[in-house]
């Protein structure tokens, strides 16, 4: 089938390019009618989580995507996408903005600061080895539920998690030349 990429805002084109390099067909989700296209996995890109959440809700895609993820559809969520998956946000971050809420994690938005706090590093990612990681106004995971596996940490903070069919990253693998995270996603 194909991988759907949420294309309402954010770094969706970069994910599409990375997946195309791996031979994957992508479809863009811009409105509810796009949900009728055949796809069997989903990418939630980085960008602005508040904007993405509101658009998912207003465009009628929030509930259908939540149901598909809960039903086992593999999902790769990066940066803002991780925030969309989070079941809980840190108290000062939770303004009631619509989210998918399918991953049992507590997330802090913009945990690494503003744009000037952005950085690049390498991480040990379970299942992939040492990978490059670009953090841009990135969140991190404060707390994980019992069914959530920590895949990577940075400076003691959880920045990559997996819960069954859901892979959540605080960083942007689509911005680096390394395909292993997208390969890991395609293997789910």
What are these regions (language model features)?
Residues 1-58, 63-70, 179-188:
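N-terminal beta1-alpha1 cap of cysteine-dependent amidohydrolase-like domains
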Residues 8, 78-80, 103, 137, ...:
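A secondary-structure boundary/capping signal
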Residues 26-27, 75, 166:
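Hydrophobic anchor at the start of a short beta-strand
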Residues 43-44, 77, 169:
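Redox-cofactor binding/interface segments in oxidoreductases and associated redox assembly factors
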Residues 49-123:
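Cysteine-nucleophile active-site neighborhood
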Residues 109-188:
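Amide-donor transfer/coupling interface in amidating biosynthetic enzymes
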